[in-house]
Amino acid sequence: MKHTRRNVLKGASVLAAAAATGGIAVPQAEANKQPYPKGMAHGLTLLTMRRNSSEDYRLGVKTEKGILDVAAAAKLLRIYAPETMDDLLQREHGPALNTLVATALTAAAAKPAFVKEETVEYGPLVSRPAKIVCVGLNYRKHAQETGAQVPKEPVLFNKYQTCLNRHNGTVKLPVDLAKKFDYEVEMVIVIGKEASNVPEADALTYAAGYATGNDFTARDLQYETGGQWMIGKAIDQFAPLGPYMLTADLVDPDNLKLECRVNGETRQSSSTADMIANTRHMISYISRYIKLKPGDIIFTGTPEGVIQGKPKDKQVWLKPGDKIACSLEKLGELKFELV
């Protein structure tokens, strides 16, 4: 017990000096530039990982020393910390995680808990969201390229837990059901505290962090079945997400460059500054109608450049073997292959 208490106090003392994020130690004053939910971690680049296929996926933190295996570090240092992303988001154990990370960065005993990033297998970034809310037509040029009216308020649809997929994973194309497969790079909001009818001015304080996602779509099912957006977008594995979630204090969500590449060719290139509904408005608007819970995620819309927006004679739909790479500034590059 004394050993545990010493470690907790030591972690608390160094926490003010640094937090691990993106491989760089960030002064606490910088980490506090953006608001974040009480009970949520801050100043961190988070991921879900495992060291081999026989293990369960668990929480990791990207640091300048490598990927910190949180469960391993907690055991070595005898300090409590949430072991999964879902535990972190739904149980408000962020301060405990920050203490563990700060302690591990300076404690020799924690050295075995740091591993090289290339040796880990990424898992689904968030695995148990109660809701996956998606915003459609949220970039003016994308609405125009698809022949849709520019919406006055966010257009909402949903995906399901079975859609979630991981970085460096595969998306199995249901070729018996559809033929017109398309990409959509998007910024994803991860909710950090319960949000119901929240004012727009406070909305960012409900975001735990942000990630890179792809709202993968079967266009023929979306448009040629009477406008069944859900069927075209909610097929299993159609929501790749990752590799990281940056905590909200480290990100200006309305000023991030985003791109999508197919087999190395850039197809989409824009900025979240071009979103019609900004991050505050989306969170506030959705919360008027749907109570958001910690761990829920929001796909925020895609910019122009999708296959659906091209002239019909130039629409070359995605096929097995294609490799997709989606990147958002600061949030990392999400990669997956079609099979």
Spans of model-derived segments:
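N-terminal export leaders
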Residues: 5-21
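A generic local secondary-structure boundary/capping motif
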Residues: 34-37, 47-49, 122-124, 144-147, ...
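Short, structured patches in soluble enzyme cores that scaffold and shape functional sites
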Residues: 50, 137, 159-161, 168, ...
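Short acidic-glycine loop/turn motifs at beta-strand connectors
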Residues: 61-66, 191-193, 263-264, 328-330
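Catalytic-pocket segment enriched in acidic/His residues
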Residues: 34-36, 217-339
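N-terminal non-catalytic cap/leader segment that marks the start of a structured domain
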Residues: 5, 12, 28-154, 323
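Secretory targeting signals
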Residues: 1-3
